[in-house]
Amino acid sequence: MTNIIRQFLRQEAAGGLILIIAAAIALLMANSALQGVYQSFLDIPVSIKIASLDISKPLLLWINDGLMAVFFLMVGLEVKRELMEGSLAGRDKAVFPAIAALGGMLAPALIYLLFNGADEVTRQGWAIPAATDIAFALGVMALLGNRVPTGLKVFLLALAIIDDLGVIIIIALFYTQQVSLQSLGIAAAAIALLAYMNWRGVGKTSAYLLVGLVLWVCILKSGVHATLAGVIVGFMIPLHTQDQRSPSESLEHGLHPWVAYLILPLFAFANAGVSLQGVSLSGLTSLLPMGIATGLFIGKPLGIFTFSWLAVKLGIAKLPDAINFKQIFAVSVLCGIGFTMSIFIASLAFEGTDIALTTYSKLGILLGSTTAAVVGYSLLRLVLPARRKAVNVR
């Protein structure tokens, strides 16, 4: 294993721990006398004005829509590399996480509807447990450092990306009140330009990032989740150029410390502050939060593992290299960490209704996601091989 990969894995393990600490601090602040300070920090207005372009948002949205697009850019780079040359290379391996993601969206939604399908209002939240928070899931997995095989980590990344894309489509179709077709049209033109640059073998990373910035602004203005731009740019940057350079690998390596030590911990701090004020035991065990929690903790692994197992047994797909079904099940439990994406859907689903619905939705998400994180981490510790000792390379 090269020194670069060892350094990357060390960054991940440390970054995962920092992410968990940041989330814990946010939860404590949101339920203490510091709640006002915490909320004021997230509400700091940040504006960018360039000519006719004017983007004004609170700091929370800049973190979620802006900094997280950088995270998704890095994820896109890594998944593309594994699809082209790594553990997901080949159609039968590449289709495996896609089928798993489909099961991971269907089963939680159906379980939620078993609890809440009879109520016209709470039925609107059917997509809440369908989401996976890729940042938190990756952060929990990172706590295990180099015990995690590359193929298993990439399976989680690919599955979560497809899951997020599915959720973005669900939001656009069912929860978005207004979509700007003009902005989407310009975004489509930017994607076409990125594809042309890739086809022509343009190796300048800065050129892709510049067009990617335009793409991000257009998707943001369109009403669709702006982090989608990061994934698209990541897939468009060439893996290799004619002079044998790898713009993709260079950018990926450069982004890792920023993502591990700054972006993900800041994201965790900004989104984990769920207030528990005014919560009662009877409300916590009502159909809405229990449907969400059960959908995340039971529905996610049930759907992902069942669809994965069937896909392999029916010959539709193959397991990634050096991965077994015990590990797949452990990761499928970890995918029950819905957290921020689920909270976002809940805020859209119950917008304009009783505020208690949003509050108890968040509690269900917190309960299901925390349980999935603890159990998923424990299962991974059991099924993964012993920690590999680092070897110094001079």
Swiss-Prot record:
Taxonomic lineage of the native organism: Bacteria, Pseudomonadati, Pseudomonadota, Gammaproteobacteria, Enterobacterales
Q: Which InterPro entries match?
A: Na/H_antiporter_dom_sf (IPR023171), NhaA (IPR004670)
Q: Which reaction does it catalyse?
A: Na(+)(in) + 2 H(+)(out) = Na(+)(out) + 2 H(+)(in)
Q: What is this protein called?
A: Na(+)/H(+) antiporter NhaA
Task performed by this protein:
Na(+)/H(+) antiporter that extrudes sodium in exchange for external protons.
Q: Where in the cell is it found?
A: Cell inner membrane
Q: Which family does it belong to?
A: Belongs to the NhaA Na(+)/H(+) (TC 2.A.33) antiporter family.
Give the residues annotated as coiled coil.
none
GO terms classed as biological process: regulation of pH
What NCBIfam families does the entry give? NhaA, PRK09560.1, PRK09561.1
Please give the superkingdom of this protein's source.
Bacteria
Instruction: Tell me the gene name.
Output: nhaA
What topology in the membrane does the UniProt record assign? Multi-pass membrane protein
Q: Which residues cross the membrane?
A: 14-34, 59-79, 95-115, 125-145, 154-174, 179-199, 213-233, 254-274, 292-312, 328-348, 363-383
Q: Which organism is it from?
A: Yersinia pseudotuberculosis serotype O:3 (strain YPIII)
Matches recorded under Pfam families: Na_H_antiport_1
* Gene3D superfamilies given in the database record: Na+/H+ antiporter like domain
A single GO CC term, please?
Answer: plasma membrane
Entry keywords, A to Z:
Antiport, Cell inner membrane, Cell membrane, Ion transport, Membrane, Sodium, Sodium transport, Transmembrane, Transmembrane helix, Transport
Q: Name one GO molecular function term.
A: sodium:proton antiporter activity
